[in-house]
Amino acid sequence: MKKDLTDPIVEFSTLVEILRWRALQQPEQRTYTYLVDGEAEGDNLTYTALDCQARSIGALLQSYRASGERALLLYPAGLEFIAAFFGCLYAGVIAVPLPPPNLAQPQRTLPRLRAIIGDAQPSVVLTTSAILSNTEGLFTQAPELQKMRWLATDKVTGSLAQEWRDPAVTSNTLALLQYTSGSTAEPKGVMISHGNFLHNSAYINRVFALIPASVTVTWLPAFHDMGLTNGIIQPVYKGRPCYLMPPVSFLMRPIRWLQAISRYKATISGGPNFAYDLCTRRITPEQRETLDLSSWDVAYNGAEPVRADTMKRFAATFASCGFRPSAFHPCYGLAEATLLVSGGSLRDECSARFKWQRLNRTASWRPAPNTRMCGHLSAVATPCTIPRLSSLIRNR
């Protein structure tokens, strides 16, 4: 019987099941296209090609009896990471995505990398042949790197796909260890299961009102929870195309992000608050004349403090390009909740009035579906002559 994938969480319990189904039912549909410099189209992956690569990498991992083990994923921006990530899932291996070491200034990235290796105890490193050859010079500075098995997945042949065996993972099987930044303490690994990914993906689809016809453009790094879930998991979950560009391509020329949205008629794209501020400051009036942002339905803003002034400036600046303020979806998320915790659109102008004497009472918050409350929030505000509200999240 043909499955109805309007809501995949009803039909499937793992990401492996979803991708396998799409490879059978939508074999030639392109799911990922890589924009090499943020502009020119490079490689792409159909569901069949992604499934084949995932089975090949999965079979290689199975040959080393890595099922249940942790694997570091050290990749540059590109499609190799996506194939390796799903390859881990196909082998029952827990993926641990991290940015590759900074070879020019190893002291900037090695401490965090070594701390995570010590905590996660990975047995395998998946990477590209280029990164492998360049990283060998760091083995003397970090001996633990040499103790792991390094596999260059860009050398894996498609013939291995025939040797793959279904790992029989379930919704409770761990898919990922998502590590925190480690800016204030040692990085901590958040355990995320297949079920966690599916439930959060279903919630994202409800909050953003996504449909299979939605089109994604992203420049967010895949090792970040927002980039991984919105840029890689969501396209497979909902069966929609995604166009990816290197983060550095956006940072060097922010216009590339909006040009891609305009060119591919993207309906969903976003990033941290600074990305919108960067576009407002760096994109010229002449460049704006070439943009059509009327297709952009969901412009999510999260991963750092969301500033109303930034959104107002962006909306005003790009109104002539067809951008609608109602497209903004401010959101709050964290790795401990897979990604999205709360969010919504700005479809209606809203205002609030407060009685100052009541602001010291605990505010009442409604959690997202299937979210377990572990504490509460307190709202704190200070009277001032300009419309301004500060909020403090306090754990007790």
Predicted regions and their residues:
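AMP-dependent adenylate-forming
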Residues: 18-45, 174-177, 184, 333
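Conserved pre-ATP/AMP-binding loop-to-beta segment of ANL
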Residues: 27-30, 150-151, 158-179, 185-186, ...
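Conserved AMP-binding/adenylate-forming core of the ANL superfamily
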Residues: 32-69, 73-86, 103-114, 158, ...
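A short helix-loop-beta submotif of the ANL/AMP-binding
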Residues: 78-103, 115-124, 214-215, 233-243, ...
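Structural core segment of the AMP-binding/adenylate-forming
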Residues: 90-161, 272-273, 278
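Adenylate-forming
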Residues: 124-134, 151-156, 249, 264-316, ...
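Conserved AMP-binding/adenylation subdomain of ANL enzymes
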Residues: 198-215, 222-267, 282-287
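Conserved AMP-binding/adenylate-forming
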Residues: 297-299, 306-331, 335-396
